[in-house]
Regions:
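Class I SAM-dependent methyltransferase SAM/SAH-binding core
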Residues: 55-98
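A short glycine-rich, Lys/Arg-flanked "PGG" loop and its adjoining helix->strand segment in the class I
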Residues: 126-138
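Conserved class I S-adenosyl-L-methionine
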Residues: 1-43, 45-54, 143-168, 225
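Short alpha-helix
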Residues: 186-203
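A short SAM/SAH-binding and catalytic strip from SAM-dependent methyltransferases
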Residues: 108-123
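A short acidic, Gly/Pro-enriched loop at the edge of an enzyme's catalytic core
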Residues: 97-109
Length: 238
């Protein structure tokens, strides 16, 4: 992990040191979309790097599925707490934009719970995606979720009144991305076109996406899903 953490990212990390944050991330359950994707793409014995693993929610459950999992998180408080609760898991303090692992060392990389969206400022996110591509084996997958800027869910007056938008210009919010300052966290909201283009520029290929099941119909859910799960693969011949 680099000695100097950018001030903006350091501010985000402070939000993950509180007792409230520990309580919030203490539910050890998989979401329906995670169950579906994990069943489709993961197999026992495969190696997986769980980035921004928090208190080890997905790390534990993937370990129980038979994967060889290593979890890293920038929050030392989270890792220490998780290590006391789950001493048999491989949990380490680590940054998603400077992963201390060899090239092509994991079959899969996972960033759950929109964890990539807290990489702030944006160059941290770009660096994180490049690092994910670097540590993936050829043919390996990166699965992550990102807040859906185009969701009608976020355009309700009740929801918008709780947000302080940090925009370079207003048009940007309606095109591809916008940073939001909410409950002390700088959070990136994105369009799916932006996510796919940015991740492919990091060296990965788009494979699939999964909407949050709000209604149960993909044609409708895409307009109301507050976040989207994405699947990317590392080319066999870069």
């Amino acid at each position: 992990m680099p000695d100097q953490i950018p001030q903006e990212l350091a501010e985000n990390l402070q939000a993950f040191k509180t007792s409230e944050a520990i309580d919030l991330y203490s539910a050890y359950l998989l979401h329906p979309e995670e169950k579906r994707l994990f069943a489709e793409y993961y197999r026992p014995g495969e190696s997986l790097l769980d980035i921004a693993c928090g208190l080890g929610r997905t790390t534990l459950l993937l370990h129980e599925m038979g994967l060889v999992v290593r979890g890293i998180d920038a929050s030392e408080v989270f890792i220490n707490t998780a290590s006391r609760r789950l001493p048999y898991l491989d949990l380490r303090v680590g940054s998603y934009d400077h992963i201390e692992e060899p090239d092509a060392s994991f079959s899969h990389v996972l960033i759950s719970c929109n964890g990539i969206d807290y990489a702030f400022p944006e160059p941290q996110r770009v660096a994180a995606l490049r690092e994910c591509a670097r540590v993936l084996k050829p043919g390996g997958t990166l699965i992550y979720s990102s807040h859906n800027l185009k969701s009608l869910h976020f355009f309700s007056p009740r929801y918008r009144s709780r947000l302080i938008w940090k925009l370079r210009n207003s048009l940007q919010a309606f095109k591809d991305r916008a940073y939001v300052l909410e409950t002390g966290l700088h959070t990136l909201y994105t369009s799916r076109q932006f996510v796919i283009a940015q991740t492919e520029q990091a060296g990965l290929q788009f494979r699939d996406l999964l909407w949050l099941r709000m209604i149960g119909n993909d044609r409708i859910d895409r307009y109301f899903s507050p976040y989207i799960h994405y699947v990317f693969t590392k080319p066999l011949n870069p």
